[in-house]
Amino acid sequence: SLVGSEMCIRDRLITTAAQQLLAGKMTLAALRTEMTRLAKQLPEYDIVRAMYGVGETTAVQLMAEIGDVRRFPRRSSIVGFAGVDPAVDQSGKHSAKSVPTTKRGSPHLRKTLYQIVCTYLKKSPVDEPVYQFLDKKRSEGKPYFVYMTAAQNKFLRIYYARVKECLEAFDAQQDTSQR
């Protein structure tokens, strides 16, 4: 009957869609495993992984999105790259008091940074500089988006300093071992 054949087609479509979803899920898991394996070979992996709020997956995401920090001449460059720096709104004598973030750069990096800062909010680690900064901005009465973005900015500056220091030490060690 017509109803029976429609149900058979529907069942086949559902089965095919489920198989495709499962295949996609398996491919994604394989890619994540490979990315993690590659990231663990980099000298900065342990430094990034040791940062508060950064898990194994988040470390890999950060490292993949940012790449080599040595390509940024200063910390403001990496903040601008992520798009968590305030935009400039000036014209003549006019200078805006409240400006949005530039949001240039990778939205995936901004999402990862947001997830990290959310961890700070949930866990409230009082001895962590990023949380202290976030809490200070929050106690000043800043809106949620403002203090979250400021904390992302702070985290990135710390990330830049720690990873750059690690890579410079690694490079120096490589230079002395090659002599």
How would you describe each model-predicted region?
Residues 10, 14-18, 38-41, 52, ...:
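Conserved phosphate/pyrophosphate-binding and hydrolysis machinery centered on Walker-type P-loop NTPases
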Residues 32-54, 62-65:
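Extended, structured, electrostatic nucleic-acid-contact surfaces
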Residues 22, 46, 145-146:
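Short, solvent-exposed positions on alpha-helices
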Residues 49-50, 56, 61-140, 144:
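Phosphate-backbone recognition surface of nucleic-acid-processing proteins
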